[in-house]
Amino acid sequence: MDLQEKLKLLPEKPGVYLMKDEEGNIIYVGKASVLKNRVRQYFQNTDNHPPKVKVMLSHVEDFEYIVTDTELEALMLECNLIKKYKPKYNVLLKDDKNYPYIKITVAEDYPRIMFTRKIDMDGSKYFGPYGSAFAVRETIKLVRKMFPIRTCNVNIEKSLGKVRECLYYHIGLCSAPCTGRIEKEEYRKLVDQAVMFLEGKREWLVEKLKEEMQKAADELRFEEAARLRDQIFAIEKISEKQKVTSINEDEQDVISMARSDDIAHIEVFFVREGKLSGREHYYMKNTEGMGREEIISSFIKQFYESSPSVPKEIIIDVELEEKDLLEDWLSQKRGNRVSITVPLRGKKKELVDMVYQNAVEALKNEILAREKILKDPAVLELSNLLGIEYPKRIEAYDISNVRGEDNVGSMVVFVDGKPKKSEYRKFTIKYVEGQDDYQSMREMIERRFLHALEEKKQIEEGTLSKEKAKFIEMPDLILVDGGIGHVNAALEVIEKLGISVPVYGMVKDSRHRTRGLVGVSGEVQMPVTGRAFRLVAQIQEEAHRFAITFHRERQSKRFKTDLLNIKGIGEKRAKVLYEAFGSIEEIKKASLEELKKVKGMNERSAKAVYEYFHGEV
């Protein structure tokens, strides 16, 4: 059936329509209060359509429609279908599936706080979405400082009293429920307080904590009262830094937008209890030829469709054609009335103007950043092969030992495809006995990131300057020397620490040359003549060189220490012996005559060395 015949069959009912190209791909999704009128408009007076619509129509070969009972149902279905198909010609919230959230697993007996990019129907509380992973991690850290709740997946019931406190307990970021140091009811109080804090109920939370502090003091529980006092101080200190808006005591999200030719930057201020509790920014794509009203409307649909919470009021700076419909949809999601306001004067107008100015500044910075960034072609090729964001900082790890002796690890750093030797780090493996590369890799990775966490804490407390920190910079990509076992070992550690970084293994062929990369989804096909392959080979060689050099230094030091125990052998003779034979094993194998021939050795010293290893001649 051709398009004209299908147009005649369109019903006079609300619903959703899906435009398709010649391959059957859905390239646009829209809703209509009357399908017959809306869809026909596309194919009438086509000369009057905006350029983007004309381009879309040139690819339309077919369409489908779904009838709904109400326009509100059509709106909800439209949101779901746009999220599912991400049509080429719809205005889209850029990479919306990747925006991060804070998750608190309140359905568990001992809830955890964690970073996530996925909302599951598991009874957990979700906060977000946030504009960046960094913002989520910093917020989680802030919450844990005030309300030390766990991030690990330890089975509390099985481990209770059987394990010792981890580092997070000692740096004040966990109350160690796994050890029984805190009662279940007290731990749940911490979780409830963290939830209130993230919900923006800070004044109410402070009042409740003050009541608990007074009660603890009256009952002579002074240590508990002091802890509550510190919590109150921390919350009030944060609140002092927030702008007082003086609108009212309800919840508002304030939204505005700035745009250039190919970028639409959305700025959102979150106002809770009359104070600015947070701000985030987002980008919309496929906005060419679209009006401000359409972009803001699309953002509201996509943002709140995936958001776990909806405020009482949304303040914007442009009138929306479907305002009433959006209010009904948002009210249904929230469970009570939500209003969308476009203020013309007063405090709300001042606030939305301020949000707009922030959007303009952020857009300027984004444009400047794009102009300044000259991405390395090899790194760019690698990011495309792996399907990840451009990894400006790549860290590579290698383990080196001989039959488990002098076990060491190395970390080399490449920034924009170039080695940054000042960032290289060495690790002496301390807690692994024998030759266990997987466990050695776990230890090295864990120590590296625990150092980073500790340094960030010290910087915040003012006891360490950022310039003196050695591990503060976080990687965008981790490469480990080895296969999937090494990859899993590294992933196990960073996931336990709540860190989100892609990890790949650098695998070698039978001739011990770089073959490519392997990840959790399998081996990555890399053209051996490509820039990315040559970069990976260079990184693998550098990681190996740095590890083996450190291993030999450790080995040499140990060998010299052994030789210095021999009467008549000093630093000088120990050095020439090591240079002549290369290892302690070869020195042990050497005959008396071979030892005598070494420059600087005489019969007495040679005999002393020989007898040290073989007994008297």
UniProtKB/Swiss-Prot annotation:
Gene Ontology terms describing biological process: nucleotide-excision repair; SOS response
Keywords (A to Z) from UniProt: Cytoplasm, DNA damage, DNA excision, DNA repair, Excision nuclease, SOS response
Chief place of localization: cytoplasm
The UVR domain, residue ranges: 203-238
InterPro entries attached to this UniProt entry: GIY-YIG_endonuc (IPR000305), GIY-YIG_endonuc_sf (IPR035901), GIY-YIG_UvrC_Cho (IPR047296), Hlx-hairpin-Hlx_DNA-bd_motif (IPR003583), RuvA_2-like (IPR010994), UVR_dom (IPR001943), UVR_dom_sf (IPR036876), UvrABC_protein_C (IPR050066)
Subcellular location field: Cytoplasm
Gene3D superfamilies: 5' to 3' exonuclease, C-terminal subdomain (1.10.150.20), GIY-YIG endonuclease (3.40.1440.10), UVR domain (4.10.860.10), UvrC, RNAse H endonuclease domain (3.30.420.340)
GO molecular function: DNA binding; excinuclease ABC activity
Domain (GIY-YIG): residue spans on this chain: 12-91
Family named by the database record: Belongs to the UvrC family.
Stated role: The UvrABC repair system catalyzes the recognition and processing of DNA lesions. UvrC both incises the 5' and 3' sides of the lesion. The N-terminal half is responsible for the 3' incision and the C-terminal half is responsible for the 5' incision.
Alphabetical list of HAMAP family matching this protein: UvrC
PANTHER family: UVRABC SYSTEM PROTEIN C, UVRC/OXIDOREDUCTASE
Subunit-structure text: Interacts with UvrB in an incision complex.
Protein name per Swiss-Prot or TrEMBL: UvrABC system protein C
Organism: Caldanaerobacter subterraneus subsp. tengcongensis (strain DSM 15242 / JCM 11007 / NBRC 100824 / MB4)
Gene encoding the protein: uvrC
